[in-house]
Swiss-Prot record:
Protein name listed in UniProt: Indole-3-glycerol phosphate synthase
SUPFAM superfamilies xref list: Ribulose-phoshate binding barrel
Cited Pfam families: IGPS
InterPro entries per record: Aldolase_TIM, Indole-3-glycerol_P_synth, Indole-3-glycerol_P_synth_dom, Indole-3-GlycerolPSynthase_CS, RibuloseP-bd_barrel
EC number(s) on file: 4.1.1.48
Keywords assigned: Amino-acid biosynthesis, Aromatic amino acid biosynthesis, Decarboxylase, Lyase, Tryptophan biosynthesis
GO BP: L-tryptophan biosynthetic process
Pathway: Amino-acid biosynthesis; L-tryptophan biosynthesis; L-tryptophan from chorismate: step 4/5
Source taxon at top rank: Bacteria
GO molecular function list: indole-3-glycerol-phosphate synthase activity; phosphoribosylanthranilate isomerase activity
Assigned protein family: Belongs to the TrpC family.
Gene that encodes it: trpC
Catalytic reactions on record: 1-(2-carboxyphenylamino)-1-deoxy-D-ribulose 5-phosphate + H(+) = (1S,2R)-1-C-(indol-3-yl)glycerol 3-phosphate + CO2 + H2O
């Protein structure tokens, strides 16, 4: 069994517990009261290369990363540094996240928020909207094509922008065929958790220009952002290096400045 399979087994068990406590109708009522969802595509189509900053306590590959007692304060630092989108991990077992983190961040920041989790049912999409998310992660490797198409359509119908994650050319093609408007290429292999930064360079050419291309994993600083930008990235997602660093606001500002450099924009055409 792969790491991804193990994570999803845990996600399904935790999901069953939440479904027993909170009905879908209750979630829909809460979602109806939530602020109107912000446009994730527009947020990531900014000048130069935009930055998604992640609230992330731990990971399967590294274990505990940071305590993050106040996720909202961290998100506010990200926003102050110039982040375009905040990513909030809500998976509990491997990443130490929660829907409470998502709710707290929503109350603090004005920019769009991505619910980052292992979404396998429409119930989780309703959770995302109910707790204030504007975007939701859908992982191609976790879904068959019928489910992927269905979840993209459901997400968009309730105001969410799907960020569809691929790990190779075949998955990117599936994401394009399913109608994704944002595709994230994750350099981390979910089978063995190793990072290969050349993954984006291989996969990006398979993604049409009208789709926002996000480089995920392996961004340690501006030099990695620039490398991804030169390979065609419209945005990067950064987590570990921010939560383990001393000054997340300054680190984000450095990334944003690199992404906005005129020479970089010119180089990307």
């Amino acid at each position: 069994m792969s790491v991804l399979d193990e994570i999803i087994d845990g996600v399904r068990a935790d999901l069953a517990e939440r479904q027993a406590r909170v009905s879908l109708d209750e979630l829909k009522e809460r979602a109806a009261r939530a602020p109107q969802a912000k446009d994730g595509v527009a947020a990531l189509r900014g000048e130069g290369v935009t930055v998604i900053c992640e609230v992330k306590r731990s990971s399967p590959s590294k274990g505990a990363l940071a305590a993050i007692a106040d996720p909202a304060a961290l998100a506010a630092d990200y926003e102050a540094g110039g982040a375009s989108v905040i990513s909030v991990l809500t998976e509990e077992r491997r990443f130490g996240g929660s829907l409470a983190d998502l709710e707290a961040v929503r109350a603090k920041v004005d920019i769009p928020i991505l619910r980052k989790d292992f979404i396998v049912t429409s119930y989780q999409l309703w959770e995302a909207r109910a707790y204030g998310a504007d975007l939701a992660l859908l992982i191609v490797a976790a879904l068959d094509q019928e489910a992927l198409v269905s979840l993209i359509e459901r997400a968009e119908s309730i105001g969410l922008t799907p960020l569809v994650e691929a790990h190779d050319e075949e998955e990117a093609e599936r994401a394009v065929d399913a109608g994704a408007k944002i595709i994230g290429v994750n350099a981390r292999n979910l089978k063995d958790l190793k990072v290969d930064r050349s993954t984006f360079e291989r996969v990006a050419p398979e993604i049409p220009d009208h789709i926002v291309k996000v480089a995920e994993s392996g961004v340690r600083g501006p030099h990695d952002l620039i490398a991804y930008a030169n390979a065609g990235a419209d945005a990067v997602l950064v987590g570990e290096s921010l939560v383990t660093g001393r000054d997340p606001r300054a680190a984000v500002a450095d990334l944003v400045a690199a992404g906005a450099h005129p020479a970089l924009r010119h180089g990307r055409g």
